[in-house]
Amino acid sequence: MSDAKLQSVLSSLSQVARQLDALPSDTPAPDSSWVKLNTNENPFPLPEIIMQSAIAALERQYLYPEDDNISLREAAANAYSVSMDQVIAGNGSSELLGLVYRAFLTPGDSVAMMSPGFSFNRKLATLQGAQFVEIEFSKDHSLPMEQLLFGPAKDAKFILLANPNNPTGTFVPVADIERLVAKSDRLIVLDEAYVDFAPENGLRLINRYSNLLVLRTFSKSYAAAGVRVGFGFGHPEIIGRLRNIQNVFNMNVIGQAVGISVLAHRAAYADNHRHIRHERRRVTLALSQLGFSVIPSHANFLLARVPTAQDGSWWQSAFARQKILVAVFPDKGLENYIRVSIGTKEQMDAFLRAASRISRILNMSTPPR
């Protein structure tokens, strides 16, 4: 295609598509020699019994997957003690988030989200032509109830809350979330992507409140980011509306098989989760000793304020020169922070060596006062 033809094609892009060019995206690892700590995957392989289910599913790859994910939804209903009509299964929880935006928003509507938050939601709002209302957490990381109920968020079609929050890793007690759900007449979308690393979850609330939708993913705690498995739990009427607009055959046979097997063998991940919690504590202490200010985390990552005048982006580049990827964010107030995923002990040792090396070089180059 000639440049002139390409420009003609690109000029036909919608205004929405052009707006998306300005939104940030994750940095992929150039090759396997890099230490990838920027997207919060679980670093361990699937347990062998679950891997076998994936291999067995490949024998059925010439057939379409089960439509409407009936067997997977039934397995989730049994595992989480809910009814099958309270469950929707998706190609990761990101697909389910997209369904919520499509189902509830039209151009000109607004959605409210706690800030700082998962940047993908800005993209979803833009795709729907919706306004994005960001509500800051209170200084102690609690929910600002007045603002959510009566302030800038009062006209939003729904309120999105991640718990634990990304990118801070902070956790709001479920009792506080219940107070918000009880007092609000709008849909509250509770994204619990990281909840398996937290002290409690809010799933039980869906049987008390019809305006709550809880999202889960197997990408973080269950090491299945590559096969894309997610769930939504809520009132059957809301779940039914979301399933109505879901694509046919939205999950592949491997994702369905792995999802069912994970649900049957969640206990196989106990050591995995213990390791991540242990490394989270160890790295928090080590970073603190290097002068970083680390926000206490209930997720599989840490958000840390860098200890020097250089900002987070500078540190990100310094780590990249040592083949280590960490995340930074454009959000107001996060310019001097980096986020690091919790990986294997070997990965975290490499990260800490790099952090120590960078700090030492900076200290050597700082003139005495």
From Swiss-Prot:
Pfam families registered for this protein in UniProt: Aminotran_1_2
CDD domains associated with the record: AAT_like
Reactions catalysed according to its record: L-histidinol phosphate + 2-oxoglutarate = 3-(imidazol-4-yl)-2-oxopropyl phosphate + L-glutamate
SUPFAM superfamilies: PLP-dependent transferases (SSF53383)
Quaternary structure and interacting proteins, as annotated: Homodimer.
EC numbers on record: 2.6.1.9
PTM annotation (N6-(pyridoxal phosphate)lysine): residues: K220
A GO biological-process term: L-histidine biosynthetic process
UniProt name for this protein: Histidinol-phosphate aminotransferase 3
Keyword RNA-binding applies: no
Signal peptide extent: none
Listed cofactors: pyridoxal 5'-phosphate
Pathway(s): Amino-acid biosynthesis; L-histidine biosynthesis; L-histidine from 5-phospho-alpha-D-ribose 1-diphosphate: step 7/9
Stored PANTHER family: HISTIDINOL-PHOSPHATE AMINOTRANSFERASE, HISTIDINOL-PHOSPHATE AMINOTRANSFERASE-RELATED
Gene encoding the protein: hisC3
Keywords: Amino-acid biosynthesis, Aminotransferase, Histidine biosynthesis, Pyridoxal phosphate, Transferase
Family: Belongs to the class-II pyridoxal-phosphate-dependent aminotransferase family. Histidinol-phosphate aminotransferase subfamily.
GO molecular-function term, one example from the UniProt record: histidinol-phosphate transaminase activity
Domain of life where this protein originates: Bacteria
Entry annotated with the keyword Transferase: yes
